């Protein structure tokens, strides 16, 4: 018999006397100590089968996801759950790194297996729980698994159809344990999967929690002002305020305003002005806008469209 078979599990860096396995109750108390209000609301909700936390950059989405995963593990001793990231690099660089830091912080003994597929086994006085780590585009590998919980991080960054297929596969696996739940955290990426699932087509078993970047008081003082300085209004609404914004269709120039950029009458004679032409060359569909300078500004005075070739466009400009 190996000495390792008789030694109690623990971490040599823990405080004196902490070699005993923690109870699940102790772990849940430790997790709640550091949660922000929106994270706590997300972690406490075990009544909805589908749950999402949608918020701006830096609001603590991945922290909330890991907290939720461990709390559900505490409630499902002896069972298996899974957590997904969009890509393998994100799984390695974001999720695993965050899990390692938090498991040590919460003093949870664990073993990590990297191959053939990554997974954690967490240990408590009451027993163990296994968390599988996977990428969303490999969701087909869940076939045959009996899971108690499945979590998605940043699911809105993959195509809507793939995210929906992955979610449907996950929901079909939720058939073991004491608490079954599908949960997701993401930044809103337009009217994508998260909007369709948790807002537009929301069902009675579905809940949505939203938060702003500013709801995290621990962000650097320069973080939010810097984004306001560099982001256009549409991205500010999505990536700082956590709001649903159509980022992919509709008005091409979202900062265009007819009130600010359209005038009824040109305030000077343009006949002697140099014409500035912006041309889109195509076969059978040449287009052009014609403008003149007004000091530092450019005034567009005409538009020519659907000319068959360059010569026809030139004649029209003359």
Describe the function of each predicted region.
Residues 271, 291-318:
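Nucleic-acid-processing active sites and adjacent nucleic-acid-binding tracks
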Residues 153-157:
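Walker B catalytic acidic pair
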Residues 216-278, 284:
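ATPase catalytic-site recognition across NTP-hydrolyzing enzymes
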Residues 79-91:
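Conserved RecA-like ASCE P-loop NTPase motor core of nucleic-acid helicases/translocases
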Residues 1-50:
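Pre-P-loop entry segment of helicase/translocase ATPase cores
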Residues 90-148, 244:
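Inter-Walker segment of RecA-like/P-loop motor cores
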Residues 62-77:
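Walker A/P-loop NTP-binding motif
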């Amino acid at each position: 018999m190996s000495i390792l078979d008789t030694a109690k599990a623990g971490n040599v860096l823990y405080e004196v006397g902490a070699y005993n396995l923690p109870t699940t109750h102790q772990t849940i108390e430790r997790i709640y100590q550091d949660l922000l209000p929106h994270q706590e609301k997300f972690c406490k909700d075990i009544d909805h089968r589908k749950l999402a936390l949608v918020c701006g950059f830096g609001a603590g989405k991945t922290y909330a996801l890991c907290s939720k995963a461990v709390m559900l593990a505490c409630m499902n001793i002896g069972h298996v759950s899974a957590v997904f990231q969009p890509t393998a690099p994100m799984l390695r660089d974001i999720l695993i790194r965050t899990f390692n830091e938090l498991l040590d912080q919460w003093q949870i003994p664990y073993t990590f297996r990297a191959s053939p597929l990554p997974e954690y086994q967490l240990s408590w006085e009451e027993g163990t729980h296994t968390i599988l780590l996977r990428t969303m585009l490999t969701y087909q590998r869940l076939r045959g698994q009996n899971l108690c919980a499945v979590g998605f991080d940043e699911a809105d960054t993959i195509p809507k159809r793939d995210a929906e297929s992955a979610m449907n596969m996950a929901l079909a696996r939720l058939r073991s344990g004491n608490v079954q739940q599908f949960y997701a955290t993401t930044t809103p990426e337009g009217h994508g999967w998260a909007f369709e699932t948790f807002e537009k087509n929301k069902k009675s078993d579905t809940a949505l929690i939203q938060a702003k970047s500013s709801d995290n008081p621990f962000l650097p003082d320069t973080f939010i002002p810097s984004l306001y300085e560099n982001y256009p209004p549409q991205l500010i609404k999505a990536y700082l305020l956590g709001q649903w914004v159509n980022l992919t269709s509709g008005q091409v120039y979202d900062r265009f305003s007819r009130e600010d950029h359209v005038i009824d009458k040109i305030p000077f004679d343009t006949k002697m002005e140099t014409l500035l032409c912006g041309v889109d060359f195509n076969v059978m569909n040449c287009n052009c806008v014609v403008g003149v300078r007004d000091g530092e500004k450019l005034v567009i005075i005409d538009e020519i469209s659907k000319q068959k070739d360059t010569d026809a466009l030139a004649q029209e400009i003359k």
